[in-house]
Amino acid sequence: MLASLLNITKVTELRNKVVYTLLMFIVFRLGIHIPVPGVEASVIESLFTSGNLFGLLDLFAGGALSKFSIFAMSITPYINASIIMQLLGAVVPTFEAWSKDGEEGRKKIAKVTRYGTVVLGFIQAFGMTYALRASNALIDNSFMSVILISIILTAGTCLLMWIGEQITAHGIGNGISLIIFAGIVARFPDGVHTIYQYLQVGTINVFQAILFAIIAVAMIVLVIAVTQGQRRIPIQYAKRVVGRKMYGGHSTFLPLKVNQAGVIPIIFASSILMFPATLAQFVQVPWVQTVASYFQWGTPIQTILYAVLILFFTYFYTAISINITDMADNMKKHGGFIPGIRPGKPTADYVDRVMTRITLVGAFFLAFVAILPNMIGGLTGIQGVYFGGTALLIVVGVALDTMQQVESLVLTRQYKGFVK
């Protein structure tokens, strides 16, 4: 592994990409420490003392939300816009045509996604700022102050979107994913320090700290296993004679990932369950406040609904992201078939059955990952440390994808890579 790392310094292109990515990370981390003007910092900090959903959102923002910096919303509006575009691509003919139109189509989708990011970002920023005004967190409670702060937050998200796109174009890995990755990794030392403080004041004992460490290591192993897990369906290609040459006749496989949906179902479910609490910030009606209290982060009702929504969205997103019928038709056109299964519709039905079974495993895994912070808090007594499976899932997934990209760049220059 050390020799492989040293090989990076020998590849000029790869070295430049790594340096560029690190420079963009520095810009990102500097922006986290630039506060939004006109906000009471002490009031903002009080929102993060109870270990609620705000803490999880702050984890993804790399600590920018608790500081209420210009990057407080992180890249969330861009992610939401991208997800919406993916969903629309399955139901809107124009977007579906763009997705099949190669590079030009991708440029059009990217352009619409950027516009969607600005719109969603301003809506989210306005809602967040308006809620802070209701909590007396603004120095100036005028409507113009709310608009100004909303514009600053939206501009911060747009800057992050630009940084992510620049990393993708000139750096290494997927820029948007790496921004989230950097934000989560940057908060890990804070989590370790919090556990140390708990030990110092006697909130937890050494046994609980060791138990937490064991659970953390076990989760890392489990997340890596599930992220890399796949069901390989064997595919055989028939031999074809063209002129005097024979083509085909080789074997391959169709990889079906256990966790095809990634963390998107968790994002969907979180967004829906955040709505009652958000509504309660604006509607000061007793029954609305009562209903919202049942959806507070960590309550039994919220936990059950969270798991159910994740199961639903895992199947939903997997269904729209993989067109099994087109897959079977393309396989048939190129002379491919699954041994023992007839080409065409029987192949599509078989793949659908297999996909349904392995998606169930992935769905339960995601649900377990999502409610893990509550379970860890109950077992170890450690609250407010967001060492959750969701964060691990993102960190492991991004790290593996980036390593594979580095691997391909190294191997093209005949260097020994990372992956054995």
Language-model-derived ranges and their functions:
Residues 1-99, 104-420:
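N-terminal cationic and glycine-rich segments that engage phosphates or anionic surfaces
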